[in-house]
């Protein structure tokens, strides 16, 4: 495991890093992920989630990476509705309804295109909301914990009927 602070939207950085490190496998966790921020400022989502993923795919292809895994989101499927008994499946059509989901769906399609065009070994996981250690403070669970610990009210989104599925990050990795 190597942690390097860099911007995947910076093609020169990505190209140099891949050429130097000679990876066998790439797991792309990098993403802008906040739905509300994607509505007020979508450009960074396009840059990071689409252009950045393209930079990683191209560097992986040119440097002989054996497998590329894209970490995506169930947001690409859109909404089920509160009274739905349906479930999202791997073959559920994508129907993104916010800039974040559209940027992740676009990245997923790029990943698929690298399999179809270059026969690159790629996989993709579209998980529900992840939680776990080191989660960014703007995310729901750490955000709510902070508010509660400070004695502040916890916001209710919309009419309070939204349903979310949560997956512990270690379970996602399995």
Residue ranges and their predicted role:
Residues 29, 147-148:
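Conserved catalytic core of Hanks-type protein kinase domains
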Residues 1-130, 170:
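N-terminal Rossmann-like NAD(P)+-binding domain of SDR-like oxidoreductases, especially those catalyzing
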Residues 102, 110, 123-124, 135-146, ...:
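Substrate-positioning beta->alpha
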């Amino acid at each position: 495991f190597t942690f390097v602070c860099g911007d995947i939207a910076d093609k020169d950085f990505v190209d140099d890093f891949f050429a130097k490190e000679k990876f066998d496998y790439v797991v792309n966790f990098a993403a802008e992920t906040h739905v509300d921020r994607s509505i007020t400022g979508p450009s960074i989502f396009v840059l990071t989630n689409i252009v950045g993923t393209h930079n990683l795919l191209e560097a992986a292809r040119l440097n002989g990476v054996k497998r590329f895994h894209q970490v995506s989101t169930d947001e690409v499927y859109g909404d089920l509705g509160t009274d739905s008994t349906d479930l999202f499946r791997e073959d559920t059509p994508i129907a993104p309804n916010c800039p974040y989901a559209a940027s992740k769906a676009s990245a997923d399609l790029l990943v698929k295109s690298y399999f179809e065009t270059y026969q690159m070994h790629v996989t993709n996981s579209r998980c529900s909301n992840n939680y776990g250690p080191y989660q960014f403070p703007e995310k729901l669970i750490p955000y709510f914990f902070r508010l509660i610990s400070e004695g502040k009210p916890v916001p209710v989104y919309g009419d309070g009927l939204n349903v979310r599925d949560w997956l512990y990050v270690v379970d996602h990795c399995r």
